[in-house]
């Protein structure tokens, strides 16, 4: 399939690998798209896995509602659920990066019975992240989350008059992305209201139920974190396993930035394959 639906919304999706292979769903983060997983997908499909990577809510042109409330976390979870149902699989391996990690943590807590394994990258369990916000320098590293609550400031900071995508590209490069990947993502963010839609993930955060963030995860989990990540600091990453009531493995990438799937796709793929093999569908 190249699209799937959740209600009236239509999502673009990469569907690669053997149709009868174990299913892996990969959820991208901000400000990226499904092709941020391409190098990982190539290696997973070579080992017989079927990989599904959607352009998520706000990133797919056919799934770009205008209201902030339409980007609440339960709705992001429902998008993943619709994709997993559309795959025909009873259970899948679920992988996320950045905001995709936030979504997959929430999915694992809502629908653990549909998952064989969970593999979030960069963003730890939400309870660990929230505690780090309150007790460490994570608060200062997350300044942009607070700035993104304003109606126009993030767009102005990142795109200037709306066409100056190089501003965003420079910020991404400063955080460890290659110039090629940063230019690619920034140019797409400058098109057709994409940035405003993507930022609504942040703006809808305050509309959620805080208690849902403290639910303990019961799915076998491997958490990936680069110790040079400028956005997700050690306090939350190192505490992540405290909130997982299942087999847990922490993979620290020494010298790794925030952008692990594209920065180190070979190692990411190797570790994912090990994790999947330990918890087969």
Q: Language-model features: where?
A:
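N-terminal cap/lid segment of alpha/beta-hydrolase-fold proteins
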Residues: 1-10
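Residue-level detector of conserved, well-ordered beta-strand and adjacent loop positions
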Residues: 5, 14, 254
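Conserved HGGG/HGGXW glycine-rich cap/lid loop of the alpha/beta-hydrolase fold
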Residues: 16-63
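Residue-level detector of flexible, active-site-proximal loop/helix-junction positions
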Residues: 20, 125, 255-257
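Catalytic histidine-centered segment of alpha/beta-hydrolase-like enzymes
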Residues: 256-265, 269
């Amino acid at each position: 399939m190249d699209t799937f639906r959740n209600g009236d919304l239509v999502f673009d999706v990469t569907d690669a690998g053997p149709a009868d292979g174990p299913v892996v769903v990969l959820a991208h983060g901000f400000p990226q798209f499904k092709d941020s997983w391409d190098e990982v997908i190539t290696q997973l499909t070579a080992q017989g896995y079927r990989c599904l990577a959607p352009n998520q809510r706000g990133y797919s042109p056919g799934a770009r509602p205008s209201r902030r409330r339409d980007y609440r976390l339960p709705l992001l979870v429902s998008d993943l659920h619709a994709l997993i149902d559309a795959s025909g699989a009873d259970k899948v391996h679920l992988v996320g990066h950045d905001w995709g990690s936030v979504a997959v943590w929430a999915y694992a807590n809502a629908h653990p019975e549909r998952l064989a394994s969970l593999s979030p990258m960069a963003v730890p369990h939400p309870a660990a992240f929230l505690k780090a916000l309150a007790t460490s320098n994570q608060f200062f590293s997350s300044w942009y989350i607070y700035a993104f609550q304003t109606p126009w400031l993030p767009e102005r900071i990142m795109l200037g008059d709306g066409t100056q995508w190089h501003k965003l590209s420079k910020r991404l490069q400063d955080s460890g992305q290659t110039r090629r990947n940063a230019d690619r993502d920034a140019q797409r963010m400058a098109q057709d209201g994409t940035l405003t839609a993507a930022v609504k993930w942040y703006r809808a955060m305050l509309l959620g139920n805080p208690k849902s963030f403290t639910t303990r995860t019961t799915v076998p989990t491997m958490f990936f974190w680069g110790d040079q990540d400028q956005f997700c600091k050690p306090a939350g990453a190192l505490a992540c396993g405290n909130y997982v009531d299942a087999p847990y493995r922490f993979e620290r990438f020494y010298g790794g930035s925030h952008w692990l799937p594209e920065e180190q796709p070979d190692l990411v793929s190797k570790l994912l394959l090990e994790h999947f093999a330990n918890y087969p569908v």
